[in-house]
């Protein structure tokens, strides 16, 4: 079936809650593995609340990584993205972001935004590689240990498939 470009179907919205809860558990586990060093984790309950929101979509590479994002007219935001450490630097994140570009183009989205911890060098490298640029900093935004905070780097990118 063909859909208007700005009304792509959210097939997972048709899933029942049991399936979505299972998916939320999977995403939460991947998130924990990816961010264990930073002591950051999105709970399964929080991820489930995202997945049932009609404004939220995701891209999933089974057992390897995912990206949860929102689209609001011509702008999109990556809410979180995680790749299992053993698959980092193996192209999974690159594939996810390329697929995200395709989805955003079909949705007539012009820009995508994200924030990333300043000490997450692997993610910073990946985002810059696919065309994201820094446009600001949130000082001491992420609390990674009991008494340690790191800045959030704000990044944006013009959506296109040309790298």
Language model features: what each stretch is:
Residues 139, 150-152, 158-162:
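Acyl-donor (CoA/ACP) binding surface of acyl/acetyltransferases
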Residues 104-115:
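Conserved GNAT acetyl-CoA-binding A-motif
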Residues 1-4, 8-14, 22-88, 94-99, ...:
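Acetyl-CoA-dependent GNAT
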Residues 84, 115-119:
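Residue-level recognition of the GNAT/N-acetyltransferase active site
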């Amino acid at each position: 079936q063909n859909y208007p470009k700005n009304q792509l179907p959210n097939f997972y919205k048709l899933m029942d809650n049991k399936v979505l809860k299972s998916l939320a558990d999977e995403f939460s586990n991947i998130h924990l593995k990816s961010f264990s060093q930073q002591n950051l984790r999105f709970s399964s309950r929080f991820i489930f609340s995202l997945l049932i929101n009609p404004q939220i979509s995701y891209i999933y590479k089974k057992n390897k990584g995912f990206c949860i994002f929102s689209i609001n007219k011509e702008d999109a935001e990556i809410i979180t993205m995680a790749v299992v450490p053993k698959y980092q630097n193996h192209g999974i994140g690159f594939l996810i972001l390329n697929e995200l570009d395709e989805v955003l183009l079909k949705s007539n989205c012009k820009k995508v935004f994200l924030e990333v911890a300043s000490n997450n060098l692997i993610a910073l490298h990946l985002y810059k590689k696919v065309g994201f640029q820094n446009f600001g900093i949130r000082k001491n935004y992420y609390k990674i240990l009991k008494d340690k905070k790191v800045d959030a780097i704000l990044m944006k990118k013009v959506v296109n498939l040309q790298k």
